[in-house]
Structures are given as structure tokens and as C-alpha cells.
A protein has these predicted regions:
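Conserved AMP-binding/adenylation subdomain of ANL enzymes
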Residues: 32-52, 59-151, 162-164, 171-182, ...
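C-terminal boundary motif of the adenylate-forming
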Residues: 300, 339-348
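Conserved ATP-binding/catalytic segment of the ANL
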Residues: 254-321, 338
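Conserved S/T- and glycine-rich ATP-binding loop of Class I adenylate-forming
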Residues: 8, 14-17, 53, 58, ...
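Conserved pre-ATP/AMP-binding loop-to-beta segment of ANL
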Residues: 1-13, 20, 46-52
């Protein structure tokens, strides 16, 4: 018998950070349907014969699995690096046009460059150049403007359109900022970019939140940085930024064929072609994870009037202060994670 879209394709286990690992059942349709959308959504990354993609995430990770399938079905060349300790050598050998990494890899590259600069004049020069890179990124971001309600939540999971911001650029960097950027590039930024290879134009960051300062630094290098959001239960990315639209703090728009909404308590709910049908041999956990056909992600989020998704924390990790205020520790952790003296951080 022919394989059908609704047939089970694989079981990927959750990390177990919030309890015992659960086997997420993903169907062939969970992979194939979003993949077909990817060729239109991100054609230069997925279906360009000149693309050379280097993956640092293990393919046991759902994001790496999904991206691998997309790339193998496309026209480019795909390579895998089993150990991030070989990052620089693998990049130098393969000369990728695209990297798939976790934020920790990006932190290591940044911290290594800062440590190499050291203190004194070189250290101050690196800090100044990094500041110019972030300023260039912020000045080149795209301006939010309201879209019709239908662009935020369509009538069904297969009709949610993706907003087009290509006609809404910001005023751009000033002449003075451009001049400072050229000086910063000549003195520092070009050397950091050289570590990432001569052909690199895109980095896809996933698997964990990326600090905003770090995102702006890499974009200021002239690299297209795409962030997304997803879980094992959503077959990896259920929202993603596009090269035309990447506002600060956002993790993009719903992947075509999916919908999102915010519950009264602030939790993000999702449904659509990417969402798993449940957990393997765990009917009670499956029933608890869904409400009226919507999957409860466990993440706190907001969606602006243009459909940009922003993740603000985990529902179970909120810290309640003595004054009764709810505080998400992730905001503090992200702001501190780029410090060169900090390898790992947790706010309790």
C-alpha cells in the first residue's frame, strides 16, 4: 500500500526538561506539507543549486531533521558537522553559504572574537565596532505597520497568508552611521566575518532563544540571520522570519498552513499542518496537551497587529515576586548570556 500523509513517519522524543521525555508522533504529512511550502517561502535557501548548507545540529533534533529533509529534496549541497569544536575548520573546508546553528555556537564565535581582542585599545576597538554593527542592524530593520485582520488569522490553517513587508523598509542608516560602519568593518568586523567563511550569507538560528544584542551584531556584519520558533510537537519551525521582514525580538510569522492565537492566560496555542497528532502511547498526556484542536505550547507569547510572534517566556518558569508581579527569567538570561565571562546562566 502507498504511504499516506496521515501515516506515522517517526517518533521524536522531547528533551524532558519539564518532566519525563515523551515520544512525539510525527506523520509524513507533518514533514511533507511544510516542506512544499518552504520552496516558495525560502527559495534561495532551500532550492538554489548554488547553496552550500552546513548543519551543526544533530539530526535527532527535530529542527535539524526538518531542515535536512528540505535541503536533501532541494538542489544545493548539504554537509554535516558532528562536533562544534571543529566549527572553524569545517567552515574553512566546506565554505558554506548557509549555517544551521544553535545560539550557543554564535555566542562562542562572538566571545572568542572579544577575548582575542582582549583589553586595552584592541578591546575598546572591538566594543566600538560591535556597537556600530548593532546600530547598523537596528537602522536596517523593517518598520511595523498594521495589516488587515485576515493577515493575522485566516479562516483556516491552510489559508493563513504571510505578510509582505518588502515595500516597508525603514529610512535606513544615516550617512554618519554608514561611515562609522565602514571604518568598523575595515578594522574589526571583516575579521569576524572571515571566520564564518567567504561565501556565507545566511545563518538560521534555532533550538533556543537568541539574545537580541547577538542577533543585531551578526546582522550588522551583513549576514542574513533568520530566527524561528518551534517544538518537537510542531515538526520544528512553526514560525520563521524572512529575509524581507525581521523586526526586533520577533521569531517571525506562522509557517504557511499553520495558525496561532494567544490564550487568556498568555499561552501560545497553535494548529495546522505542522502540528503533531499526539504522544506515543500516552493518551492522557495527548488529551491534556490539546484544547479544542489547538496545541498548548507552554510558552508565553504575544502577536502584534502585523502577525509577528514574540516569545516572552515559559508558562511554568514564571517567577512571582513578593509584590505579586510575574517575571520571566529568560529576559534576564538572554541579556547576560553574551558576556564573555559567562558560559552558562540560570536566573532563579
Amino acid at each position: 500500500d502507498a504511504v499516506k500523509l496521515g501515516d506515522e513517519a517517526t517518533v521524536i522524543y522531547t528533551s524532558g526538561t519539564t518532566g519525563m521525555p515523551k515520544g512525539v508522533v510525527l506523520t509524513h504529512g507533518n514533514f511533507i506539507s511544510p516542506m512544499l511550502q518552504a520552496y516558495d517561502f525560502l527559495p534561495l535557501l532551500i532550492n538554489d543549486p548554488k547553496s552550500r548548507s552546513l548543519l551543526f545540529l544533530p539530526v535527532a533534533h527535530v529542527l535539524a531533521r526538518f531542515v535536512m529533509y528540505c535541503l536533501l529534496a532541494g538542489q544545493g549541497i548539504t554537509a554535516f558537522s558532528p562536533d562544534t569544536r571543529n566549527l572553524v575548520n569545517d567552515i574553512a573546508t566546506f565554505k558554506p553559504t548557509m549555517l544551521l546553528v544553535v545560539p550557543r555556537v554564535m555566542e562562542k564565535v562572538y566571545n572568542a572574537a572579544a577575548a582575542k581582542a582582549g583589553g586595552g585599545m584592541k578591546g575598546r576597538m572591538f566594543a566600538w565596532a560591535a556597537k556600530q554593527a548593532r546600530a547598523l542592524s537596528k537602522a536596517s530593520a523593517y518598520v511595523d505597520s498594521p495589516l488587515p485582520e485576515s493577515a493575522v488569522a485566516g479562516p483556516g490553517p491552510d489559508t493563513t497568508p504571510i505578510p509582505d513587508a518588502s515595500a516597508m523598509p525603514s529610512p535606513g542608516p544615516s550617512t554618519a552611521l554608514k561611515l562609522r560602519g565602514r571604518v568598523a568593518d575595515a578594522l574589526v568586523l571583516s575579521k569576524v566575518r572571515a571566520i564564518l567563511g567567504p561565501n556565507l550569507h545566511t545563518i538560521i538560528s534555532g533550538g533556543a532563544p537568541l539574545a537580541l544584542d547577538l542577533a543585531n551584531f551578526y546582522r550588522g556584519l551583513g549576514i542574513t540571520l533568520l530566527q524561528g520558533y518551534g517544538l518537537s510537537e510542531t515538526t520544528g519551525p512553526i514560525s520563521v522570519e524572512t529575509p524581507q521582514d525581521f523586526p526586533p525580538d520577533s521569531v517571525g510569522f506562522p509557517w504557511p498552513g499553520n495558525r496561532m492565537k494567544i490564550a487568556p492566560d498568555g499561552e501560545l496555542l497553535v494548529q495546522g499542518i505542522s502540528v503533531s497528532k499526539g504522544y506515543h502511547n500516552l493518551p492522557e498526556a495527548t488529551a491534556e496537551a490539546y484544547v479544542d484542536g489547538w496545541f498548548k505550547t507552554g510558552d508565553l507569547a504575544s502577536i502584534d497587529d502585523r502577525g509577528h510572534l514574540r516569545i516572552t517566556g515559559r508558562k511554568k518558569e514564571l517567577i512571582v515576586t513578593a509584590g505579586g508581579k510575574n517575571v520571566s527569567p529568560e529576559v534576564l538570561e538572554e541579556s547576560l548570556s553574551t558576556h564573555p565571562l559567562i558560559a552558562n546562566i540560570i536566573v532563579v
